[in-house]
């Protein structure tokens, strides 16, 4: 398993968040991977997640050492390297139409608040849980709100051969402190997608709070 270094999708993502080192659109952090090994369904998805989180652990350690150099031991020691236990992660297959569903905007008020014709709405009952893909992309905590056209454009570039040959899994998010921020309020999500037509994986992570 290895990261895809160059892809047209990265250029698109940079238009949405030019200052980020990650490939972010809204609150969705995208990781594109490919593998020399044959695709074996769910075990391959788990391998893709393991690769992504190994890289995130390395980055968290690097960030801690950078903080040590810049701000000293006291500050750096308050930072903890990322921890995860993928053996605790549970996966459920997702229907394509459910995953890629995108509502229409029915109203936008003076302050920029948006109303959709979707059945799902953020409330106290679903606070800190998994949010729909469309919501994570279109309703970030800070910064610009994206529109249904953006949702469509992002996925057309990400999956240029269409969605018919995609295998999608939704994962629980109680197996890594990466998701702690999202559990506080906005939401935490982990999805893995395998595109049979392109023989590549897309791991999508969401974890945000105010």
Predicted regions and their residues:
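Extended, low-hydrophobicity segments enriched in charged/polar residues
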Residues: 1-162
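Acidic, proline/glycine-rich low-complexity IDRs
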Residues: 144, 148-210
């Amino acid at each position: 398993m290895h990261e895809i270094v160059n892809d047209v999708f990265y250029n698109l993502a940079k238009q949405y968040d030019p200052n980020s080192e990650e490939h972010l659109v809204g609150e969705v952090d995208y990781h594109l991977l490919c593998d020399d090994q044959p695709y074996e369904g769910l075990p391959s998805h788990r391998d893709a997640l393991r690769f992504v989180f190994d890289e995130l652990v390395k980055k968290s350690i690097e960030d801690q050492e950078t903080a040590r150099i810049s701000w000293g031991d006291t500050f750096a020691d308050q930072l903890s390297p990322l921890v995860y236990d993928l053996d605790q992660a549970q996966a459920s297959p997702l229907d394509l139409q459910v995953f890629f569903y995108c509502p229409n905007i029915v109203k936008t008020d003076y302050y920029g608040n948006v109303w959709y014709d979707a059945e799902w709405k953020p409330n106290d009952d679903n606070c800190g849980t998994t949010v729909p893909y469309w919501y994570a992309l279109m309703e970030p905590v800070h910064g610009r709100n994206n529109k249904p056209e953006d949702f469509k454009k992002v996925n057309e570039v990400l999956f240029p051969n269409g969605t018919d040959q995609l295998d999608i899994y939704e994962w629980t998010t109680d197996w890594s402190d990466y998701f702690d921020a999202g559990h506080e309020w906005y939401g935490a999500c982990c999805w893995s997608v395998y595109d049979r037509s392109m023989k590549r994986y897309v791991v999508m992570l969401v974890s945000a709070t105010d």
